[in-house]
Amino acid sequence: MQDLFGSVRRSLVFRSTTDDENQENHPPPFPSLLADKITSCIRKSMVFAKSQSPPNNSTVQIKPPIRWRKGQLIGRGAFGTVYMGMNLDSGELLAVKQVLITSNCASKEKTQAHIQELEEEVKLLKNLSHPNIVRYLGTVREDETLNILLEFVPGGSISSLLEKFGAFPESVVRTYTNQLLLGLEYLHNHAIMHRDIKGANILVDNQGCIKLADFGASKQVAELATISGAKSMKGTPYWMAPEVILQTGHSFSADIWSVGCTVIEMVTGKAPWSQQYKEIAAIFHIGTTKSHPPIPDNISSDANDFLLKCLQQEPNLRPTASELLKHPFVTGKQKESASKDLTSFMDNSCSPLPSELTNITSYQTSTSDDVGDICNLGSLTCTLAFPEKSIQNNSLCLKSNNGYDDDDDNDMCLIDDENFLTYNGETGPSLDNNTDAKKSCDTMSEISDILKCKFDENSGNGETETKVSMEVDHPSYSEDENELTESKIKAFLDDKAAELKKLQTPLYEEFYNGMITCSPICMESNINNNKREEAPRGFLKLPPKSRSPSQGHIGRSPSRATDAACCSKSPESGNSSGAPKNSNASAGAEQESNSQSVALSEIERKWKEELDQELERKRREITRQAGMGSSPRDRSLSRHREKSRFASPGK
């Protein structure tokens, strides 16, 4: 045994080249052959193979499939149904899209091929991560369905929000479009084309963040569902580009066309082309004419330019998603530039501005319900009444012939381009008068949402000069003008309040019309009295509409009472007409107020009598229908209760 190990040691360490040459000419002895075999075995063993890298078991190991449980139905599409699911391992909520797998033997091979392609593509999509795209979590294959596990977005799609809330304002459209382009830019940078951008495939979470869904693998899903006998993509032709319909080959520019159609959908609340053509007619029209959908008229110039660039007929002329992210409609830079221009104009004016008001965004808006906050621009006086606007919307928007027109905000100062004012020898746009702004206000709600602009010129030495100053925390430039403006506004509000009060009940309207037709003096005294007593007592308390009698019964008593009031007042007014004004003014006012109070008390008494008669008539009808009578005692008690109930009609 020792000789054996000794020979092995000598063969490993002490062998020389001469021994090898001798072995070539002479056959080796038996111990030497055994030593060579042992040496080769040792060299092939793991002791001498440490330098070789072991196989990576982590890449070879396949993760177990996600265990999930199906929940309620979320939606149903052309290529399958979407359910809510739960990951049984982590508890995460999922959106599971189920695609049917055909059992036909003829198309089984094609089905398996598409399933493998879809699974491979989902594996690639799992590596994508962006806040504006839906994450792919994996696939689970079952006997008759293929389940695609997606990120669950709780808010719903844009199309569902349009059905609930109607068309979006332009500010919301701008926010959603910006996020849509960010997600689309990420997909295009990873060489992924969406192919089916529309409101139904754009999801919104609770924070207003949108996420693109059904991208990348949509082509494989469509082919797989077509083999299974699913219907065509319903509604999608409205968003298709002409090159997609003609099947002449399309690229990322087809997604840009769909972005423009989606913006039209958000602005109008309806799918593009849906008002003019049905689906088949829309396909024929788009494919033959290559025209873009009609652009709405109620959008700004920036939004119009954005849509025209997205809906170019030639695909090569359409901008990319990265270029559209720099458009003024998405960034809103034109609005900021208009604010900077206004700030520079105020800095160069003759009246110095406070240091804290050099930035246009620092203008203060009123958070109270009154209309008392007035900021004076010298002779340009703007009354701000924004009780419901947040601080984020405190920038002043000016509308000119080339300015930014923001349709979603009503708090803007309208500028008339046709009229001009002179400023240091130069001409510029002038502002509308306050009376014109008042004419556009028809309701009380519009008073708190519009910016009233008052313009007057201060003439001196034969030259017209416009002084601009901003004094928010200081007294106004002219207290008399402020008082006059406030009095006009209060008078306007009083008139509107009186008109609204008239519409509350037909009784007051008929009484008011009778007073007007009978005597103008009564009408004037009534209006003056109402204005004097409006704060402590308000308007006349009238019975509710539901308990008021018919118009035929009420129409007689006010007219008779009015005639009586006018007849009783006419001698007194005739006697006082010939007297001097300085001695009989107070007596005439007292007589008018007394006659009016008598007329009102007479009308109230007539109303109460007619109400009692009407209630008694209804009570008899109810008793007759029930077939049972009531005793005189019960009738008197009930009548007493009804009288006490209607003693105060306003309660």
Curated annotation (Swiss-Prot):
Residues 464-477 have a biased composition (Basic and acidic residues). GO terms for biological process: cortical microtubule organization. It is found in: Cytoplasm, Cytoskeleton. The keyword Kinase applies. Residues 570-599 have a biased composition (Polar residues). One of its GO terms (cellular component) is cytoplasm. Keywords: ATP-binding, Coiled coil, Cytoplasm, Cytoskeleton, Isopeptide bond, Kinase, Microtubule, Nucleotide-binding, Serine/threonine-protein kinase, Transferase, Ubl conjugation. It catalyses: L-seryl-[protein] + ATP = O-phospho-L-seryl-[protein] + ADP + H(+); L-threonyl-[protein] + ATP = O-phospho-L-threonyl-[protein] + ADP + H(+). Expressed in roots and flowers. Its main location: cytoplasm. It comes from the Eukaryota. Its EC number is 2.7.11.25. ATP binds at I74, G75, R76, G77, A78, F79, G80, T81, V82, K97. PANTHER family: MAP KINASE KINASE KINASE SSK2-RELATED-RELATED, MAPKK KINASE. This is Mitogen-activated protein kinase kinase kinase 2. It comes from Arabidopsis thaliana. The lineage of its organism: Eukaryota, Viridiplantae, Streptophyta, Embryophyta, Tracheophyta.
